[in-house]
Each structure stands twice: as C-alpha cells, then as structure tokens.
Amino acid sequence: MTEINWKDNLRIAWFGNFLTGASISLVVPFMPIFVENLGVGSDQAAFYAGLAISVSAISAALFSPIWGILADKYGRKPMMIRAGLAMTITMGGLAFVPNIYWLIFLRLLNGVFAGFVPNATALIASQVPKEKSGSALGTLSTGVVAGTLTGPFIGGFIAELFGIRTVFLLVGSFLFLAAVLTICFIKEDFQPVAKEKAIPTKELFTSVKYPYLLVNLFLTSFVIQFSAQSIGPILALYVRDLGQTENLLFVSGLIVSSMGFSSMMSAGVMGKLGDKVGNHRLLVVAQLYSVIIYLLCANAS
C-alpha cells in the first residue's frame, strides 16, 4: 500500500474547498442584476435569479447519490477532478451566455456535476487517523466557510471594476485551479468497499438512538436554509430600492459577506452557550432572534 501523507492532502483539499466555496458564493450578490442585463424585465428579475440559483441546488441533490455510488466504486479523487473540471466549464461558461435560457441551462448542469466538497471531505475522512478525525474535518470545513465569506466581497469588487461577466471567468479559473491541484498533489490509495461490508441506509437510520429527533432537525434545517437562501436572489434589487445605486454590486457583496462573517465569529460563542444553557433553548432563542432581524430588514429605509 502506498504511504500517504494525509496532512498534505488536507492542505490541498482545504485550499480546493476554499476555491470552491468562493466560486459558489461569488455569483450570488449580483445574479438579479445579471439577469436584468440579459434582457429580463425588473418585475421578473427576482424570479429568474431565484430559479438560476435554486436549479443548481436541486439538480445537485438529485444527482449526488449517483456520484456517491461512483465514488464508492472508483474513488474520491476522480470525483473531485470530475467536479472541478465540469464546473470550470459550467461556471466559466456563464460569461458567454446570450440569454436567460442559457443561464438556467448552465446552472442546471453545474448542479448535475457538482460534488467537489463532499468528496474532499470523504477522502480526508478515509485517510486521517481516527483520533485526529474531528480536528482534521473541522479544519477542512473552514475552507468552505472562508471561501463563502470572502466570495461575495471579491465578486462585488471585481464586478464593479471589470463587469459581471469577468467574475464568471474568475470563478472558472478558481475551479480549474482546484482541479489541477487535485490532479497534481492529492494522493489516494483507494480500495472499493465490498458490498457485504456496506451498511444499508435503512439500517443506518434505525441504528440512530432518537430517529424522530433526526427528522425534526432535518426539517428545521430545511426551513432555516430555505429562509436564508431566499434572500440572495432579491438582495441586490432590495438594496437598489433603498436608494443605493452607486457601487451597488460591491455593497450587495459586502452585505452577504458580513452575514457570513458574523456567523463565523459567533459560532464558537454559541456552541459554548449551548453547552451551558442547553441547545434546545438556544435554538428557540436563535430562531426568535432571526425573526426579529428579518422583520427589521423588511422595514429598513
């Protein structure tokens, strides 16, 4: 068996996750403005921007089980390369779309071929020593968080200076770099999982001590993510309605980045507070707090 330095893999996977996270979030702040630039009226821009963003997530959810099966058969590294190269085309190609239909089509394909981050996570999880798995996977996850934080800020800045289409070329370059780094530096000595060792999904679910709690957490997370992600397609339009027309793209990107940055800064504090007062109470308070904040945003002037 080939000796693999998992720490080297972790560093490259972290940077790849950072580039991928930045690429995903780069386009969110100005998507409705780009939709308008493609000839869609301002009264329909929010709808088509939301469609362009959500169609990628929907197709990713539908096709991710297929890529998961192939990853179990051929390895995680090939799936990381496949995702990186495919998304280079689907995201970079957005710089050349002539109309809204091509935008929706490429966003759909982007979701179909996505999967860099989950395969990077699975690869590192399979290589890191068990006693270091928590810290290693936690470190790896910060790559996506850091990319998601900085992406909107960078995207808004570049869009103001060079135009929105230039941002898509930058995104394509980021994803291509992630694929190249994976090809050149990620090492994997993959051994397919024997069918008799694979645990059925039903058995995994029934082995959970409180399965109803898992379902409730899934539904709660779904509602929270649904609510939070619904802001992206309308944010730039809302900021413009508030009278901010100068540096609109940069301001929109800054707002998105600030939300992510505040989440990152408070995560550790909230975790400790949850251990002290109870996670259930903290979840209730956090959801009420979110309701108040969004109501205040709705009445901003």
Predicted region positions:
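Juxtamembrane intracellular "pre-TM" segments in multi-pass secondary transporters
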Residues: M1-K7, E188-L217
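Pair of pore-lining "gating" transmembrane helices in MFS-fold secondary transporters
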Residues: W6-I33, N37, Y210-S230
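Short amphipathic helix-loop junctions that connect adjacent transmembrane helices
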Residues: F30-A46, I234-F250
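Central cavity-lining transmembrane alpha-helices of secondary-active solute carriers
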Residues: L51-W67, S257-V269
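Conserved MFS/SLC helix-loop-helix module at the cytosolic interface between two early adjacent transmembrane helices
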Residues: L62-P98, G274-H280
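Paired small-residue
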Residues: T90, Y101-L109, I293
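Cytoplasmic helix-loop-helix junction between adjacent transmembrane helices
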Residues: L106-V145
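Symmetry-related core transmembrane helices of the 12-TM Major Facilitator Superfamily/SLC fold
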Residues: V167-I183
